């Protein structure tokens, strides 16, 4: 059996989740704003990093400075929580629409 890719993992765990699920799925809110909650959650999971958390922005999408190796370290529960904040996996990076 082949190993699940990060694209497949994010689709399996968060594919049906949207930011409309934020209030239902996120119990310990760091902010009432889903996007800010996601950024604060990522900061707590990966503490001590320097530089901006937003790596790139284009039109209505931002790419966060977290790559495939970082994504592999996330638990399934964290992926569900991030998905409820509008975070998704795209082009080997975490991303959000805004």
Segment roles from a protein language model:
Residues 1-58:
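N-terminal leader/targeting segments
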Residues 20-22, 46, 66, 88, ...:
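Phenylalanine-focused residue identity feature
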Residues 42, 62-64, 96:
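Generic structural hydrophobic/aromatic packing signal, biased to beta-strands
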Residues 48-60, 89-98:
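Short glycine-rich, low-complexity/disordered patches
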Residues 51-81:
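Acidic, low-complexity, intrinsically disordered interaction modules
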Residues 70-98:
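Short, compact, well-ordered microdomains
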């Amino acid at each position: 059996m082949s190993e699940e890719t990060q694209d497949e993992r994010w689709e399996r765990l968060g594919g049906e989740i949207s930011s409309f699920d934020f209030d239902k799925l996120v119990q310990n809110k760091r902010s009432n704003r889903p996007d800010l909650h996601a950024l604060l959650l990522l900061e707590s999971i990966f503490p001590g990093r320097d530089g901006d958390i937003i790596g790139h922005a284009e039109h209505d999408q931002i790419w966060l400075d977290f790559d495939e190796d970082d994504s592999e370290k996330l638990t399934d529960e964290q992926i569900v929580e991030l998905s409820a904040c509008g975070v998704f996996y795209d082009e080997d990076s975490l991303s959000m629409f805004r």
